[in-house]
Swiss-Prot record:
Organism phylogeny: Bacteria, Pseudomonadati, Pseudomonadota, Gammaproteobacteria, Moraxellales
NCBIfam families noted in UniProt: RNAse_H_YqgF
Protein's name in the database: Putative pre-16S rRNA nuclease
A GO cellular component annotation in the UniProt record: cytosol
Signal peptide feature range: none
């Protein structure tokens, strides 16, 4: 297996300061397309800015199997989690966006309790499901309107994040309820 970390030669130093430059290390980012019944997941690489559909988790009234979700974050070495924020088209909050925000706070709190160095943020996910369904139809990945596309939506969310990472909102774990 090839490590995707770019390692610089130890002789690579800044000629002005004589200090070795740090190696460029990609971070794995987990995008979550939050939903009350299911949640799509995609993994992204911060260096290549690519994403791939990962899984769809069953939700119990908006709550995941926390042990499973935290296990995925640990095992994959995720550095950041981007939770989709389903705003209304005019940018106002919806009932689902309030639940997604609450979920993100709870996730940040649980990550903090586990002493994991993971940042949780929210990112606007308007129209990701529409785009995901269109892509899935065009590629023959789904056969009918009821086939799940949540993981594809999470990929599109990741692309949105990569296009403008500064538009995401970091979540403070202290405010978890």
């Amino acid at each position: 297996m090839v490590d995707s970390t770019l390692i610089k030669d130890s002789n690579d130093t800044d000629t002005d300061t004589g200090v070795a430059e740090p190696a460029i290390k990609p971070h794995l980012i987990l995008a979550l397309d939050y939903g009350v019944k299911k949640m799509g997941m995609a993994l992204g690489n911060s260096l290549t800015e690519t994403a791939r559909a990962f899984d769809i988790l069953a939700m119990n009234n908006g709550q995941p199997d926390w042990d499973n979700l935290l296990g995925i974050i640990k095992v994959w070495g995720v550095a950041k989690v981007v939770v989709g924020l389903p705003l209304n088209m005019d940018g106002s909050s919806s009932m689902l966006s309030k639940r997604a925000h609450k979920f993100a706070r709870r996730l940040a709190h649980r990550i903090m309790e586990q002493h994991l160095p993971v940042i949780v943020s929210l990112c606007d996910e308007r129209l990701t499901s529409v785009a995901a369904r269109e892509i899935a139809w065009e590629n023959g990945w789904i056969q009918n309107e009821r086939d799940p596309i949540d993981d594809i939506s999470a990929c599109i969310l990741m692309s949105t994040y990569f296009a403008d990472p500064n538009s995401s909102i970091a979540i403070d774990a202290i405010k978890a309820d």
